[in-house]
């Protein structure tokens, strides 16, 4: 009974969240969503990834093996055309390795060597390096890539503070290049107020906060000086690696879409790494 209730809820959510929304925005059998390529007053992401609205086509389920294909099958190609679906394999982890290799960081060569196997799995590689389960390695990897704090990472892992400290220490000792890269990119953001993505696009850190820890509203420089005095620092620099990696992934994906268009293939939608 419990499984049937859960399934009913899942189907109802798919119907109300996806199908009804798609039909609401259908015009002569077509969907013309609002596409935000960069951050603006009406939407978009700070990293430069695409976002969609009215409807949000990125919310179409993909992981549900039954409902995902059913909903996707509602979208049909033009007559005489065929859909193609392409996605990157471990795009963001590979970018982390790329930037760590550019700086010649200690420990990254082991991952580079492992990647010579086309089927290599970054999270499994790191799990073996750190001697921890793959699930924990993946949680820590993604948490660090996305600028997740220690407390949130601990909660995601579902372990107590002492175990978390031991686990993080073991991870950083055996996979040192991730934290080294994270700290390096953070320093660049703090010193320069920006980091540059793969294609040279600037991700700016223009807001400021007081040096002391606590919950503070990030402000423009002059406002932060007036509010807190000279003891201020750039805000959100802990997310610098995330901006670099996601921003570079966005560059790479958009460049690929342009190249596809040049070859006569029309990109219709981009969802995450697909």
Question: Where are the language model's segments positioned?
Answer:
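Conserved catalytic core of nucleotide polymerization and phosphodiester-bond processing enzymes
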Residues: 1-274
